[in-house]
């Protein structure tokens, strides 16, 4: 998920994303995504994308650690320009490792289905 966040320079104050936590100026409403995201990064400089985007993609395509990724873009950073290296835009193929099923488990499931009177299969979910 890509969402807007507070201003990195903190000049516009208050903004919608801020919550009433006067002890910590870094807390925003987007922090609510931290507990449910496998990867969370607040983009407060344009060059942060050079590391954050590949990390987010790696997390989302790793079968062991996969999960949602959240990139929270500070509003003023969204309007900044940055001279990204050309190779950053080279198309990439993200290959997802697919572990093979355990042959014993496949045999057990096949036996259970064959022995069932009215088998029902709910598939999906990884």
Residue locations for each model-derived region?
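N-terminal alpha/beta PP-like core and its mobile active-site loop of ThDP/TPP-dependent enzymes
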Residues: 1-126
């Amino acid at each position: 998920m890509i969402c807007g966040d507070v201003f990195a320079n903190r000049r516009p104050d208050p903004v919608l994303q801020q919550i009433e936590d006067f002890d910590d100026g870094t807390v925003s409403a987007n922090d609510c995504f931290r507990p449910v995201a496998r990867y969370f990064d607040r983009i407060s400089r344009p060059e942060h994308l050079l590391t954050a985007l590949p990390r987010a993609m790696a997390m989302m395509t790793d079968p062991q650690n996969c999960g949602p990724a959240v990139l929270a873009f500070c509003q003023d950073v969204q309007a900044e320009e940055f001279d990204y290296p050309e190779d950053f835009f080279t198309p990439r193929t993200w290959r997802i490792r697919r572990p093979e099923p355990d042959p014993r488990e496949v045999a057990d499931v096949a036996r259970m289905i064959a022995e069932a009177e009215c088998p029902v299969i709910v598939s999906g979910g990884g």
